[in-house]
Amino acid sequence: SKNKRLLKPVILSHHMLLGLKGESKMSKSDPESAIYMDDQEMDVNRKIKRSFCPIEGLDKNPVLQYVKYIILEIFKVVSIVRKEENGGDKDYDNYAELEKDFLSGSLHPGDLKKAVSKYINKILEPVRAYFKNNPEAQKLRSLVKGYTK
């Protein structure tokens, strides 16, 4: 019947990101292995700076996954800030070119991580502002946090 069709559950799924330490997936038991919606800027910066970012085994590189599956999907262009002696700033509008430069060594993991931190923080800023300015959201957040301890 029509009512049954309206009540069917919907599942929204996405690519499962690797854990930041190189694990096959993020772990709720290790807060350093994932970026959370309520992470502060300094948390994101620390986590990305310490993250696993190998040049070999690109399919095991969580930093590149953030670029491919999140950042480029939202921003369409990733700007990497680099010193002039390292080739200067460069914009990437596709993942393949960024990956090629990363593999060749012309894109250093440190420069990539700084850019990823910047973009993840841009994504999270409206969430942070919402929770900061909304007492009801703060209460709900505290309630959820209570379940994760």
Regions found by a protein language model. Name each.
Residues 1-149:
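Conserved nucleotide- and phosphate/pyrophosphate-binding catalytic cores
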